[in-house]
Amino acid sequence: VKAKNKFLLAPLTNMQSPDQGRISDDEFIWLTKRAEGGFGIIMTCAMPVLKSGIGWKGQLGIYDPKHEDGHYRLNERLHNLEALSIAQIFHAGIRADINYSGDKIGPSMNSEKSAREMSIAEIEQMKVAFVECAIRAYQCKYDGIELHAAHGYLIGQFLSKKFNKREDDYGGSFKNRAKFLIDIIEEIKEKTSSNFLIGCLLYTS
């Protein structure tokens, strides 16, 4: 996979798709205009893998089949403009909007954010949600996905010693704290193709 140039539109939060996560005309135009202007790679804003992972109102979604038509349409236009397309996916975790999540969850209990600790079963279900959304992105003709593991969202919460106090296979050592992320990446690799790009946004603090 090769981009036509090094100009990349970063995943910017626009809050332009308030219709239950369906891509709006405003967001469609905003993204495609950048490709019309010559950007070689277009990235979406962070899209939740479950409704419970929504971080703010107006967020573009990819967690439901009803979102697919909009993503097909977006990718058709971007590819006609010779731009690569990347879907950024995430779950807000303890930073989720309570109006959508109803029940905030994270790797460990967080009283400040009124979040409870995820069970092993919930962790497994969450990994499935990430993989299913990556597959949906692949089927909707995105050239790749980026896992958002920064800015204090769920994957980053698992990586962080501050937020991850677990004493099981998902906590403690860095290897254990990274297991959630690594498992997701490996499963996506198995269920897409070698040409499907898999990236990860990380930060060091």
How would you name each of these model-derived features?
Residues V1, D26-G37, Y72-N80, V131-E146, ...:
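Short amphipathic alpha-helices and their capping/turn segments at secondary-structure boundaries
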Residues V1-F90, M126:
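N-terminal capping/small domains of soluble enzymes
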Residues L60-L81, K165-F196:
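Alpha-helix-loop-beta-strand connector modules within alpha/beta enzyme cores
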Residues E76, N80, L84, F90-Y142:
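Non-globular sequence segments
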Residues R116-L154, R166-E187:
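Metal-dependent enolase-superfamily TIM-barrel catalytic cores that perform enediolate-based chemistry
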